[in-house]
């Protein structure tokens, strides 16, 4: 077990615990959110695509519908975030609102699916919305190599993920690394998940729970891989 600690001041804190889970596709966000919520009896909120009215159109024509999709996600996540913040219970959210702007809309713009004009308009609206939200207490970043992510995605075989490539995952991974180097809204707990089975190994989950409960004052990386 190897812990690397690097202190960096975070933003202000809310009177209650609000934790957001971030990470690439297939990193294990939903699994961790479910288990932390169950273990600590916290409110949980999950990323959902079932009722998203823009997804079918988006997958049919990404260039035409990328802006609409990102605006929908912004409103949905802001509403989800505020509901969690109003709830007196501690809460953990599957996917942060920040990733939409700094990772996914940026990727759409980079690949030519989101026009410059639309991208700038979206980022301006994003800044206005996020500026009105209180900062979370902690961001948990799940870090995982691209080859492991790809294997997990292929194993779970979701229809909407059939077009995901290692090139796309690598692009997202590079954006995550760049974003987190500058992120100072709240403390960040980075967890390597390529060899950390908190689904089937109770002790691994307990280690993560313990670190989250400490309400970190800086940045810490957990690496539970065998040496």
Feature map (PLM): residue ranges:
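Post-Walker A alpha-helix
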Residues: 32-33
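Conserved substrate/cofactor phosphate-moiety recognition/catalytic segment
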Residues: 38-76
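Glycine-rich phosphate-binding loop used to anchor ATP phosphates in small-molecule kinases
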Residues: 65-134
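P-loop (Walker A) phosphate-binding loop of NTP-binding proteins
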Residues: 24
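NTP-dependent small-molecule kinase module
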Residues: 8, 151-163, 167-227
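Hydrophobic anchor at the beta1->P-loop junction of P-loop NTPases
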Residues: 21
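Conserved lysine of the Walker
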Residues: 29
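A glycine- and Lys/Arg-enriched "phosphate-lid" helix/loop adjacent to the NTP-binding pocket
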Residues: 103-177
């Amino acid at each position: 077990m190897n812990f690397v600690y690097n202190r960096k001041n975070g933003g202000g804190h809310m009177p209650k615990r609000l934790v957001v889970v971030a990470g690439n596709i297939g990193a294990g966000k939903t699994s961790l959110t479910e288990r932390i919520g169950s273990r600590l009896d916290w409110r949980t909120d999950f990323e959902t695509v079932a009722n998203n009215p823009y997804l079918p159109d988006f997958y049919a024509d990404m260039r035409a519908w990328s802006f609409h999709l990102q605006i929908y996600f912004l409103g949905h996540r802001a509403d989800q975030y505020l509901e969690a913040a109003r709830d007196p219970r501690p809460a953990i959210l599957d996917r942060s609102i920040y990733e939409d702007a700094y990772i996914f809309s940026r990727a759409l713009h980079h690949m030519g699916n989101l026009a410059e004009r639309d991208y700038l308009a979206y980022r301006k609206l994003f800044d206005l919305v996020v500026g009105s939200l209180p900062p979370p207490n902690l961001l948990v970043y799940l870090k995982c190599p691209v080859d492991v992510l790809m294997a997990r995605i292929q194993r779970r075989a979701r229809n909407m993920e059939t077009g995901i490539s290692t090139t796309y995952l690598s692009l997202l991974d590079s954006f995550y690394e760049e974003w987190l180097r500058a992120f100072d809204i709240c403390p960040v707990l980075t967890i390597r998940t390529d060899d950390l089975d908190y689904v089937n190994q109770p002790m691994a989950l307990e280690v993560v729970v313990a670190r989250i409960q400490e309400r970190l004052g800086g940045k810490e990386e957990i690496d539970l891989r065998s040496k």
